[in-house]
Amino acid sequence: MITRQYTLKARSLPKVDYHCHINITEYSDPANPTVISVSKEEFIADLKEGGIDKAVILSDRRTTPKQVADFCKQAPERFIGFGYVNPILIGSDEDTRKQREELGLYGLKLYPCSDGYSPDDTHAFKVYEVASELDMPIMFHHAGMPVPYDYLKNTNPAQIDVVAQCFPELKIVLAHLGYPRVDETLYVARKHRNVFCDISWPYGDVNHPSFVYLLWKDLLTALNMGVLDKIVFGTDYPGVRQRPYVDMLMDINRYATHDDLKLPMDRVMNMLDKNIHSHGLVP
């Protein structure tokens, strides 16, 4: 059972869940979808229960940018929308521009693993150019997905290394800590000032006590590499609700067997707000 060892105190900056959806679609078989939808009221109630002020809502392969934009308009003080394109397709650069200028979406979510391209494919560069020009952060789904059409080879941190080098002004967020290539992902964040990571649902059973241990271990690696301040909070809502994930962070040091192995809680809490706002990852 998770018990809070640290109190979530009032802070000056809005706390943000940087990785949310309005449907569970990422893991669904397109031919046999299993979709759980949430209403605006349910979403806001869950945010309040978790002590979170705002949420980044992501488009994906079957939740359109228009759907996300319309949902965000219901509570613009709470919701920040991200669009979606397949960047190797013709016209995806124009679509990116429209999603920002016409739909009002702030960033993009890309799925190289399931859309079948490498992030460093030069055909995708036209989208990176537009996103960089418009100051649109790009979040990459940077982990495996347990579906037949997913290819782990397209979530290699070495590919992001190339993109970050070619587009130094492009803000890149690597979702799920790059699991299972966590250490390599953190190293890319260390190498490039424009690369960040979120901690959304990177492992199997989020309700198992070992989940806290795995996240603690990876955040300790981030601390050692000097990139803990480039890690941002995210849940993968509605798959994971905000309250239990925040509770887990409050108890993140439960497996630290020595004071030297404890994560500094003020910097852990920065993942919810300061790390997001100070790097311009939200408006």
Where are these regions (language model features)?
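Active-site gating/metal-coordination segments in enzymes
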Residues: 62-155
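Catalytic pocket-lining loop regions of alpha/beta-barrel enzymes
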Residues: 106-107, 120-232
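Acidic/histidine-rich helix-loop elements
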Residues: 21-38, 147, 207
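Conserved, mostly hydrophobic/aromatic
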Residues: 19, 47, 68, 108, ...
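Mid-to-C-terminal alpha-helical segments outside catalytic/metal-binding sites
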Residues: 1-14, 18, 31-54, 225-230, ...
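Divalent metal-dependent hydrolysis catalytic cores, especially in the metallo-beta-lactamase
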Residues: 20, 32-36, 40-62, 79-84, ...
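Histidine-centered divalent metal-coordination motifs
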Residues: 14, 19-25, 141, 176
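Short, acidic/polar
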Residues: 35-46, 89-100, 182
